[in-house]
């Protein structure tokens, strides 16, 4: 018998259903990726509601862009009432179905939970969250020992080395941030 964790093994959440769209059972999703091909090439998905722990497998019949959202036509969802029941479900795909990236690019799941160290070897913490700011991503690093949060921009200036395979990141220390005051004033 398959457990839920087995069901989600090797899968990655790429979007969340946020609304129904139209009267024919389409759903509006917000993507969790900037790589549009991940969404536009969807074929088969696992829809999973983390609150109710319900899941639903479906074939994607059509994908349409809609501003910063996408609209999906899914097999088995035939009308607006059925589509509204899917609000809150996350859209999962197999990790193997993700498009390949060059060595400088990464998917968020590849760096979440990575161990972060300063150049001198001092442990900073683990990547807990990635924040999109518009200009560049920022990693939120949490150290469980002292409950400190450190924010580091994901730019070449601050990221010295990122090893996706080892889940480790070497970063440049932001002196004013570490001292607790803005020394630039």
Swiss-Prot record:
The keyword Mitochondrion does not apply. The keyword Cytoplasm applies. GO terms for biological process: ribosomal small subunit biogenesis; rRNA processing. Pfam families: PRC, RimM. It is found in: Cytoplasm. Signal peptide: none annotated. SUPFAM superfamilies: PRC-barrel domain (SSF50346), Translation proteins (SSF50447). Keywords: Chaperone, Cytoplasm, Ribosome biogenesis, rRNA processing. GO terms for cellular component: cytoplasm; ribosome. Residues 103-177 form the PRC barrel domain. Its main location: cytoplasm. GO terms for molecular function: ribosome binding. Binds ribosomal protein uS19. The PRC barrel domain binds ribosomal protein uS19. Belongs to the RimM family. PANTHER family: RIBOSOME MATURATION FACTOR RIMM (PTHR33692:SF1). An accessory protein needed during the final step in the assembly of 30S ribosomal subunit, possibly for assembly of the head region. Essential for efficient processing of 16S rRNA. May be needed both before and after RbfA during the maturation of 16S rRNA. It has affinity for free ribosomal 30S subunits but not for 70S ribosomes. HAMAP family: Ribosome_mat_RimM. This is Ribosome maturation factor RimM. It comes from Petrotoga mobilis (strain DSM 10674 / SJ95).
């Amino acid at each position: 018998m398959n457990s839920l964790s087995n069901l989600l093994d090797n899968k990655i959440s790429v979007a969340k259903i946020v609304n129904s769209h139209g009267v024919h059972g389409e759903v509006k999703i917000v993507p969790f990726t900037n790589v549009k091909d991940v969404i536009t090439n969807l074929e088969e998905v696992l829809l999973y509601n983390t609150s109710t722990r319900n899941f639903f497998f479906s074939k994607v019949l059509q994908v349409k862009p809609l501003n910063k959202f996408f609209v999906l036509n899914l097999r088995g969802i035939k009308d607006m009432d059925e589509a509204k029941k899917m609000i809150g479900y996350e859209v999962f795909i197999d990790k193997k179905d993700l498009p390949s990236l060059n060595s400088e690019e990464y998917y968020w799941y590849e760096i979440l939970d990575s161990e972060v160290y300063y150049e001198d070897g001092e442990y900073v913490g683990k990547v807990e969250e990635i924040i999109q700011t518009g200009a560049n991503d920022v990693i939120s690093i949490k150290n469980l020992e002292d409950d400190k949060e450190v924010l580091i921009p994901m730019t070449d200036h601050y990221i010295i080395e990122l090893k996706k395979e080892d889940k480790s990141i070497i970063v440049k220390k932001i002196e004013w941030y570490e001292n607790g005051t803005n020394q630039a004033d």
